[in-house]
């Protein structure tokens, strides 16, 4: 029978720690097997070294009481050297970081760490030690064998086996047995069939020296012990010659996991019954099923209770008198010692202090003497050493020290010099980079301008976007994107026209698609040809035929296709070479007078290319083109091609601009094919009519500004010199445009010679400011044009787009133009912005566009219209009014309502247009994204001005075919918002195409934007103005902006007034007090954006009304429960009793004895006689006599010894007492009945005159005497002596005004001490009389009891703020009161806008106080109620005011019933205020509109107004002056169009004219004063120039807030920024070469004849060469550094 394994049977006494090592290894294997593997790799194999051996002949070489050596050898044999090093496997992620096994142990009462102490003590016997057969006789000296878990082993040199590193697969785990069997019998080791195969032992590696690290030596002892354990376990198996292969399997865990509840051993029962359980469970822990809890502590036994009782009794005994804890003996009862007052200083104290101070002075003097003596000694020593003769070594050391110090100084200086050189080189590199970046930005901007101009000209010529392919300058677009756009348009067209198989448009489209592949192959073939080959190929272009008007539109023939291809190829060449017929702004061309010969050759090639075609080739024949070009070349030199807008742009060749500076502006999808036929037809008709006009008529027509064609509006004005001839079409419109005829011959003569300046701007009004780049050359023309601004609109010409038959109503002329423009956008597959001013009918034009799509293109939808919540119903009503044929879905309501409306969402027949709000789009964005929309229209598109907002990002991802933005304010704050709108229209698809990048866009226009915001529009230099002009050209294809003053000449005028309001006294105190607070100053200086905004909002609240900042409190008095005087009540009563209590036996009451006759005058004689008659004197006398008899008969003798005598004596005393009472009553009754008056009350009242009540006769009680009483009453006497109620009424106003100071404290019991008891009774009686209810009848109004003191009493007890203080506390309300009274007297009605909702509440109180009728609209107003309120206000003239919120109530509401707009406060965004004022100044308004702005002077509101003016100025320059109108090019002649291409010096200006223009200014009126100022700067002193600049800035800063439009004449002295180009400032020394003083330069040459340079040049060259390939550190953007946590990614 095998014995159970134990520590005694397995290990010898000499190895007690081996069990611990084995246990750690087993636990490591349970945790994943990596610990054991790590042990075998790290300890047995020693990190790849030869296997370690053991020597059992020396079993006691390790001692437990000695510390092992650091480099101790644990094996007899030397491990081999050439064994490859094996890497330790990486720990798996599921393995715990904690150490396997205990990390500390306790030895002899001391805790030791197991990591640094390698010898562990002998652990306790293993409770779960595994048993093995043949475990006896383990103490053997035979060779051992180490068995691994995988069964693979090999013999060591001494007979042991080592695991093969090649086999690492773990064996399968043996099936687990039940817990019962596991506990009863030992576990037997099982081996698999795979492990029973014989394997030849691996030959041992060659011997090698050990190369292991010190780290493995720490675990050598554990390895030896592990080997000893294995040796003892396999001793019996090694008795034979051949040791069998035995595989030991170790379980993953010490216990079998439980997989079923039945495997859990049930806890044995404690006791047979509950009583038995209660008896036993007290000592058993809760964990084992008992009742003993560990936190309860030991059981409270009788002994413990007895001990505690003895302690308590002892304490009680000691507390008694005489005990240890008594009050007399215990120290705790002693009073705390009182602090003694400090002792007063005496003479002794002053003496001690003086002595201490003197001691300190003596010690300090002694220290100074010692230091001085030491210094003298050292000086003497140094002097003695100096006088001694020096040896050579000392001299050498001194010289060495001197040279070392000099070397350090030189090295430091040289190092600083090289650092300065490095800084200078980096500065130059940075400057070069900035110049290169500017060139790149300008080249990209020029490319964008060229693309926009090409698109405009292509649209104007009627070719739409067919002429603009990838070769027309859009090199930045990839071929894949173009093909994808073609496919997308083809699919869309196919979907729209599935049911129209016989339609001509669909036929054209299909034919276009079929020939697309052939055209692509042809284009690919043309790409490989040179210019000469292309000229030869397309030399003979057939002329366009003259089709008749009855000819139907047919499919394009291959001949037409070749013509189109030819035009495309020619347009490509012209675009690349900056042809004058295509480019209106050639910034990419040569700008230097010193152009190379290559530029001249390119220009000659361009002239020859013009013969081939271009955009003019589609309108004219080859002969006409050659004639026109020859005339232009004859008049214009070839070398005069300069850029007149950007003189500082360096020359960049077209090839470089195309390759290096590519810029992706917008993606140009192909147009719909069915439009091409109509456009070609219109083009042919235009050419036909043009050819029929005689040449003489053409010359005359060329000079007229108002002449235009009917169909395609092709203008051909020519100058009198016939130097230029080309078409002047409007690239703005794809359809026919409106022309304005001259109103008078004096204004626009028929033979007006062309000038070099731009055309005149629209009429200058309060809304439109003339652009400084496009103003007239003479002031007379501008005046005449301004005088005709109120004239009726001209008669419209024939429009290309007919009014859809679905539209109900008549469109105005400008609305027809807008419809043409929108239809042209759709035809070109271009998205746009309709930015007409508020009130011009953007809604109607949008509805007309959708109706046009349904009628012409048969596209009924689905369309998505996203509008603000306030105008949803307005849009629905407009659709039903103007286009009832559309099915409208108003998508709003609760979640259930919206879900019900989405039923049949994907069915196109249920509805055509979906109208919803921005909020609902964000809430249900997943539903909207799944639907494919044809047209997405955004009303009030400035809601998506922030590209970082969720609204912008959500709407950007919608699946739409076309997009249209409606906004009255395309530019509100900055150009970033404008970029957000443009990129939303033209997003990039898969990172390709789309509008320009935000950073690129900012680089283009950062300079003019900063100049406008900082210095105003008048301070812009020429470069900034040129950039603004190019911005206009970039925006013109996508933006249509008309003003009311431009399109509607009968619009009423609009006047703006700024009312400055003084702060009230309370406002000024709150305003100054808030600013003077310390925390406010710290917040404003901290730079925290949110905190600063919060402070500014508080200041704005004070300016609007002080109640928004601090409410006026309700003042009440503090009520005391008990007054101070009441504490002396008892004392007062006692004193009064002692001093005033009379003695009844000393004083005689004369009134009681009837000795005062006048005391009874209050009784009448009748009453006195009746009292005498009712006297009961006789009855009282009888009772007295009867009581006397009873008293005398009572027992009178007293015998104290008997009870009867005592009782009888007491009864006798009581009887005599009653007798005395009856006798006293008889006495009193006799005196009282004898009281009689001398005259009596009735006689006194009869004889009393009553002078105090004489003026008022009492009202007679007889009715017939009442009339006589009224007649005898005197009103004069009544007015002279008023009653109490009349007096109270007269003082009521004074009491209400001046009874405003409540007492600080009031009490309840003060009246009785002040008035006394009688006074309180008198007032109480009077109060009861006053509070008596007044009789009233049902038909009479109720009357309050007449209480004359009620008003004063209430006002002195509680103080409510006077409602009139609401107005007097605020300066704005005072001005508003006067303004409303003035408006009401004049019959005007007003809209009052404010930004804050709480201000609306105050305005309501204000209007209620004054009794004005008003309506209110804010964000809380429901959508259904907004239209009702709007209609009510417009139809009810009795309503004076309509108060609205700027943010909620000002959008999309038509309030033409009012003619006055009052802005109570300024919005941060001036565009919001402009939208609000346009709600009444719009089409339909018949009266002039006055706008009043209430601004608190000397406050933050003045600064807000100034900032708003700056933002409005930026909008005027970027948007208003751009003239984004349909008739923009109608006012331009050919000369104006090509003025940017002409060189000023090519017009015959010589050097004298240039010098004269330099001093007095040239023909350009915008720059004359700037040039004069520059010339004056050169003549004046530097100090005078600097002072003039400062003064001019101050003047312009003051004028910027009051002037509406810029003045043509600038100040006398101009600034360098204004007139001097970069690098030409006088203060910077940048003079011209002519004006600079001539200094003769002396050149030096070296021996080789080369020019000698300075050392600085050499150092700069060396450093530049070294830093040539290093990274240049660019300056950090300060704005980005402040964006903490914000998104700064590029979009």
From Swiss-Prot:
**Domain called Helicase ATP-binding: residue spans:** 823-988
Chain ranges for the short sequence motif DEAH box as given in the UniProt record = 939-942
Read off the SMART domains from this record. Answer: DEXDc (SM00487), HELICc (SM00490)
What gene codes for this chain? SWR1
- What family does this chain come from, according to its entry? Belongs to the SNF2/RAD54 helicase family. SWR1 subfamily.
Where does this protein come from, organism-wise? Gibberella zeae (strain ATCC MYA-4620 / CBS 123657 / FGSC 9075 / NRRL 31084 / PH-1) (Wheat head blight fungus)
Q: Which reaction does it catalyse?
A: ATP + H2O = ADP + phosphate + H(+)
Q: What is its EC number?
A: 3.6.4.12
Query: Its biological function?
Result: Catalytic component of the SWR1 complex which mediates the ATP-dependent exchange of histone H2A for the H2A variant HZT1 leading to transcriptional regulation of selected genes by chromatin remodeling.
Q: Where, in this chain's numbering, is ATP bound?
A: 836-843
Task: State how it assembles.
Answer: Component of the SWR1 chromatin-remodeling complex.
Q: Which GO terms describe its cellular component?
A: Swr1 complex
Q: Where is the HSA domain?
A: 335-409
What is the protein named? Answer: Helicase SWR1
Domain (Helicase C-terminal) spans: 1375-1525
């Amino acid at each position: 029978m095998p014995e159970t394994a134990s520590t005694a049977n397995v290990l010898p006494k000499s190895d007690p720690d081996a069990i611990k090592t084995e246990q750690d290894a087993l636990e490591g294997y349970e945790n994943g097997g990596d610990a054991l593997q790590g042990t075998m790799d790290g300890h047995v194999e020693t990190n790849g070294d030869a296997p370690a051996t053991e020597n059992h002949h020396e079993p006691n070489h390790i001692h437990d009481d000695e510390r092992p050596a650091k480099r101790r050898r644990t094996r007899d044999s030397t491990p081999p050297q050439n064994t490859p090093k094996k890497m330790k496997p990486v720990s798996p992620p599921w393995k715990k970081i904690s150490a396997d096994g205990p990390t500390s142990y306790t030895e002899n009462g001391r805790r030791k760490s197991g990591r640094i102490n390698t010898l562990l003590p002998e652990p306790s016997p293993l409770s779960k030690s595994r048993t093995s057969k043949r475990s006896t006789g383990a103490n053997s000296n035979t060779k051992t064998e180490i068995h691994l878990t995988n069964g693979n082993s090999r013999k060591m040199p001494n007979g042991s086996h080592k695991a093969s590193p090649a086999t690492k697969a773990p064996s399968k785990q043996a099936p687990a047995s039940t817990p019962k069997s596991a506990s009863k019998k030992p576990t037997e080791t099982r081996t698999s069939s795979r492990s029973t195969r014989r394997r030849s032992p691996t030959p041992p590696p060659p011997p090698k020296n050990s190369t292991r690290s010190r780290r493995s030596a720490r675990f050598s002892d554990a390895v030896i012990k592990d080997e000893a354990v294995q040796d003892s376990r396999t001793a019996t198996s090694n008795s034979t010659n051949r040791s069998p292969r035995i595989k030991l399997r170790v379980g993953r865990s010490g216990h079998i996991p439980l997989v079923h509840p039945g495997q859990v051993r049930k806890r044995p029962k404690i006791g047979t019954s509950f009583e038995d359980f209660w008896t036993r469970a007290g000592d058993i822990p809760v964990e084992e099923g008992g009742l003993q809890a560990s936190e309860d502590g030991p059981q409270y036994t009788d002994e413990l209770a007895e001990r505690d009782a003895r302690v308590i009794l002892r304490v009680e005994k000691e507390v008694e008198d005489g005990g240890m804890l008594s009050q007399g003996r215990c120290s705790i009862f002693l009073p705390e010692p009182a602090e003694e007052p400090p002792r007063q200083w005496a003479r002794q104290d002053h003496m001690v202090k003086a002595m201490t101070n003197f001691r300190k002075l003596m010690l300090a003097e002694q220290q100074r003497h010692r230091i001085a003596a030491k210094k003298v000694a050292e000086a003497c020593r140094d002097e003695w050493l100096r006088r001694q003769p020096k040896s050579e070594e000392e001299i050498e050391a001194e010289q060495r020290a001197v040279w070392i110090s000099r070397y350090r100084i030189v090295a430091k200086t040289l190092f600083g010099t090289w650092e300065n050189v490095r800084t200078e080189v980096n500065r130059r590199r940075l400057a070069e980079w900035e110049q290169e970046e500017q060139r790149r930005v300008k080249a990209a901007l020029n490319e964008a301008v060229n693309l926009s101009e090409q698109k405009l000209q292509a649209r104007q010529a009627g070719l739409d976007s067919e002429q603009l392919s990838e070769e027309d300058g859009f090199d930045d677009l990839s071929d894949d994107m173009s093909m994808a756009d073609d496919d997308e348009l083809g699919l869309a067209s196919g979907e729209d026209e599935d049911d129209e198989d016989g339609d001509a448009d669909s036929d054209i489209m299909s034919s276009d698609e079929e020939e697309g592949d052939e055209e692509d192959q042809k284009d690919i073939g043309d790409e490989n040809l040179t210019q000469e080959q292309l000229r030869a190929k397309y030399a003979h272009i057939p002329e366009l035929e003259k089709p008749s008007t009855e000819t139907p539109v047919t499919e394009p023939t291959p001949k037409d296709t070749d013509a189109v291809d030819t035009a495309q190829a020619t347009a490509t060449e012209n675009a690349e070479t900056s042809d004058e017929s295509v480019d209106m702004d050639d910034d990419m061309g040569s700008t230097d007078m010193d152009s190379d010969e290559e530029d001249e050759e390119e220009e000659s090639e361009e002239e020859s290319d013009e013969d081939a075609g271009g955009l003019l080739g589609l309108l004219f024949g080859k002969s006409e083109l050659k004639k026109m070009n020859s005339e232009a070349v004859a008049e214009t030199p070839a070398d005069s091609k300069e850029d007149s807008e950007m003189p500082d742009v360096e020359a960049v060749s077209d090839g470089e601009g195309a390759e290096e500076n590519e810029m992706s502006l917008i993606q140009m999808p192909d147009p719909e094919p069915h439009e091409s036929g109509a456009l070609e037809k219109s083009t042919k008709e235009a050419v036909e009519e043009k050819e029929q006009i005689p040449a003489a008529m053409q010359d005359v027509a060329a000079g007229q500004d108002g002449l235009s064609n009917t169909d395609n509006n092709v203008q051909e004005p020519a100058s009198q010199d016939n130097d230029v001839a080309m078409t002047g079409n409007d690239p703005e419109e794809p359809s026919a445009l409106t022309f304005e005829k001259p109103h008078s011959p004096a204004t626009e003569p028929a033979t007006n010679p062309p000038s070099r300046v731009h055309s005149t701007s629209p009429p200058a009004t309060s809304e439109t400011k003339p652009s400084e780049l496009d103003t007239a050359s003479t002031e007379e023309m501008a005046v005449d044009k301004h005088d005709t601004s109120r004239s009726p609109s001209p008669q419209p010409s024939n429009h290309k787009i007919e009014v859809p038959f679905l539209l109900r109503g008549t469109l105005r002329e400008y609305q027809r133009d807008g419809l043409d423009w929108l239809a042209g956008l759709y035809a070109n597959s271009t998205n746009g912005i309709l930015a007409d001013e508020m009130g011009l009918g953007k809604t109607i034009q949008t509805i007309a566009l959708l109706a046009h799509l349904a009628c012409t293109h048969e596209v009924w939808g689905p369309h998505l219209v996203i509008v603000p919540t306030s105008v949803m119903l307005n849009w629905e009503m407009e659709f039903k009014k103007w286009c009832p044929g559309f099915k409208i879905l108003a998508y709003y309501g609760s979640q259930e309502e919206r879900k019900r409306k989405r039923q049949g969402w994907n069915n196109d027949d249920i509805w055509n247009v979906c109208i919803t709000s921005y909020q609902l789009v964000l809430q249900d964005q997943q539903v909207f994204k799944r639907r494919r929309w044809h047209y997405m229209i955004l009303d009030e598109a400035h809601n998506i001005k922030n590209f970082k907002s969720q609204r912008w990002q959500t709407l950007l991802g919608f699946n739409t075919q076309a997009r249209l933005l409606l906004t009255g304010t395309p530019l509100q704050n900055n150009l970033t918002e404008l970029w957000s709108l443009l990129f939303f229209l033209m997003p990039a698809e898969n990172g390709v195409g789309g509008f320009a990048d935000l950073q690129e866009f900012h680089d283009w226009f950062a300079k003019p934007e900063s100049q406008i915001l900082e210095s105003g529009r008048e301070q812009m230099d020429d470069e900034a103005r040129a950039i603004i002009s190019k911005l206009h050209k970039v925006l013109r294809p996508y933006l249509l902006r008309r003003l009311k003053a431009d399109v509607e000449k009968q619009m009423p005028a609009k006047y703006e007034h700024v009312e400055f309001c003084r702060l009230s006294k309370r406002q000024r105190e709150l305003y100054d007090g808030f600013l003077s607070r310390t925390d406010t100053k710290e917040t404003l200086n901290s730079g925290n954006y949110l905190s600063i905004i919060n402070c500014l909002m508080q200041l704005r609240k004070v300016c609007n009304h002080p109640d928004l900042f601090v409410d006026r409190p309700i003042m009440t008095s503090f009520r005391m429960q008990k007054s101070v005087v009441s504490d002396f009540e008892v004392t007062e009563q006692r004193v009064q009793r002692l001093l005033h209590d009379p003695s009844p036996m000393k004083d005689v009451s004369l009134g009681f004895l009837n000795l005062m006759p006048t005391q009874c005058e209050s009784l009448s004689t009748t009453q006195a006689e009746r009292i005498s008659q009712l006297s009961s004197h006789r009855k009282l006398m009888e009772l007295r006599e009867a009581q006397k008899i009873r008293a005398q008969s009572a027992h009178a003798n007293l015998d104290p010894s008997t009870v009867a005598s005592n009782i009888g004596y007491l009864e006798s005393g009581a009887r005599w007492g009653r007798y005395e009472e009856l006798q006293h009553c008889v006495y009193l009754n006799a005196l009282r009945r004898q009281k009689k008056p001398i005259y009596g009350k009735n006689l006194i009242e009869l004889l009393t005159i009553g002078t105090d009540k004489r003026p008022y006769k009492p009202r007679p009680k007889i009715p017939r005497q009442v009339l006589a009483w009224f007649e005898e009453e005197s009103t004069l006497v009544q007015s002279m002596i008023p009653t109490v109620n009349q007096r109270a009424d007269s003082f009521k106003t004074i009491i209400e005004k001046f009874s405003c100071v409540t007492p600080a404290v009031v009490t309840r019991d003060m009246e009785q001490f002040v008035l006394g008891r009688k006074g309180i009774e008198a007032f109480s009686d009077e109060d009861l009389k006053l509070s008596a209810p007044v009789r009233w009848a049902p038909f009479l109004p109720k009357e309050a009891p007449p209480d004359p003191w009620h008003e004063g009493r209430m006002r002195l007890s509680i103080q409510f703020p006077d409602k009139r203080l609401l107005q007097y506390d605020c300066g704005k309300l005072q001005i508003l009161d006067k303004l409303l009274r003035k408006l009401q007297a004049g019959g005007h009605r007003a809209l009052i806008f404010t930004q804050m909702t709480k201000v609306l509440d105050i305005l309501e109180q204000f209007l209620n106080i004054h009794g004005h009728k008003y309506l209110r609209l804010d964000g809380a107003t429901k959508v259904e109620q907004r239209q009702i309120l709007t209609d009510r206000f417009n139809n009810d003239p009795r309503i004076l005011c309509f108060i609205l919120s700027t943010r909620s109530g000002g959008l999309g509401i038509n309030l033409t019933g009012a003619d006055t707009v009052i802005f109570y406060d300024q919005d941060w965004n001036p565009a919001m205020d402009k939208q609000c004022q346009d709600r009444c100044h719009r089409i339909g308004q018949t009266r002039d509109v006055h706008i009043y702005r209430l601004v608190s002077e000397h406050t933050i509101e003045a600064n807000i107004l100034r900032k708003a003016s700056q933002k409005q100025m930026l909008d005027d320059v970027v948007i208003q002056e751009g003239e984004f109108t349909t008739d923009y090019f109608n006012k331009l002649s050919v000369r104006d169009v090509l003025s940017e291409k002409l060189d000023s010096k090519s017009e015959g200006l010589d050097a004298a004219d240039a010098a004269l223009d330099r001093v007095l200014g040239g023909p350009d009126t915008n720059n004359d004063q700037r040039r004069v100022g520059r010339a004056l700067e050169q003549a004046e002193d530097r100090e005078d120039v600097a002072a003039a600049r400062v003064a001019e800035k101050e003047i312009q800063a003051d004028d910027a807030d009051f002037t509406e439009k810029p003045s043509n004449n600038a100040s006398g002295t101009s600034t360098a920024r204004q007139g001097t180009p970069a690098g030409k400032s006088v203060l910077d020394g940048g003079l011209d070469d002519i004006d600079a003083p001539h200094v003769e330069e002396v050149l030096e040459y070296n021996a080789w004849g080369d020019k000698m340079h300075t050392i600085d040049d050499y150092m700069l060259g060396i450093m530049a060469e070294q830093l040539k390939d290093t990274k240049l550190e660019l300056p950090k953007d300060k704005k980005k550094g402040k964006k903490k946590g914000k998104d700064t990614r590029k979009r």
